[in-house]
């Protein structure tokens, strides 16, 4: 019975830590870029896009498709970085619990 109570206490602590981590992820920002920095995207680790920056040299009607491709690429770069930031936070939270890799509690 004591083991069960200990597990329940540990689960409650983990839930509290998960909530704090989720709140913290709102404030972790990453930036993805493409085209050598001509297009950049800033987003939170929870993948909420905060800003897109486009160099004025790309604002030409005949370069629209290139610009669109660069925006997609920058979004992908930012998304990958956001995933890494989230995984690092999760690892810090669950590292001592002995959970299998990739369990994904988030």
Curated annotation (Swiss-Prot):
The keyword Cytoplasm applies. The keyword Kinase does not apply. Keywords: Cytoplasm, DNA-binding. It is found in: Cytoplasm, Nucleoid. Pfam families: YbaB_DNA_bd. GO terms for molecular function: DNA binding. GO terms for cellular component: bacterial nucleoid; cytosol. Binds to DNA and alters its conformation. May be involved in regulation of gene expression, nucleoid organization and DNA protection. Belongs to the YbaB/EbfC family. NCBIfam families: DNA_YbaB_EbfC. Homodimer. This is Nucleoid-associated protein Nham_0463. It comes from Nitrobacter hamburgensis (strain DSM 10229 / NCIMB 13809 / X14). The lineage of its organism: Bacteria, Pseudomonadati, Pseudomonadota, Alphaproteobacteria, Hyphomicrobiales.
């Amino acid at each position: 019975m004591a083991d069960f109570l200990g597990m329940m206490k540990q689960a409650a602590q983990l839930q509290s830590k998960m909530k704090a981590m989720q709140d913290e992820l709102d404030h972790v920002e990453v930036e993805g870029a493409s085209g050598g920095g001509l297009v950049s995207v800033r987003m939170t680790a929870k993948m909420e896009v905060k800003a897109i920056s486009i160099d004025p040299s790309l604002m030409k009607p005949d370069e629209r498709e290139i610009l669109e491709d660069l925006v997609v690429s920058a979004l992908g770069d930012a998304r990958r970085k956001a995933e890494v930031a989230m995984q690092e936070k999760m690892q810090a939270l669950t590292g001592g619990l002995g959970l299998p890799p990739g369990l994904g509690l988030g």
